[in-house]
């Protein structure tokens, strides 16, 4: 499974981005919990979740900065 591209997220609305951020944070928490209890079978999913979260937060900050300029 390749890392998600930022272009995949650009089409989402602001509300959907916020929802995705919350869902990704929850997913990352669950993955960390599995890692701590040694139940994580696919450790690369932690990296993917972090990457996805960074992309979504970047988009959110870019959109808020663009909204402030207007």
Swiss-Prot record:
The keyword Ribosomal protein belongs to this UniProt entry's keyword annotation: yes
UniProt key word Ribonucleoprotein: yes
GO cellular component, one term: cytosolic large ribosomal subunit
Pfam families: Ribosomal_L29 (PF00831)
One record GO biological process: translation
Example of a GO MF term: structural constituent of ribosome
Keywords assigned: Ribonucleoprotein, Ribosomal protein
Family, per entry: Belongs to the universal ribosomal protein uL29 family.
Name this polypeptide is given: Large ribosomal subunit protein uL29
Lineage: Bacteria, Bacillati, Cyanobacteriota, Cyanophyceae, Gloeobacterales
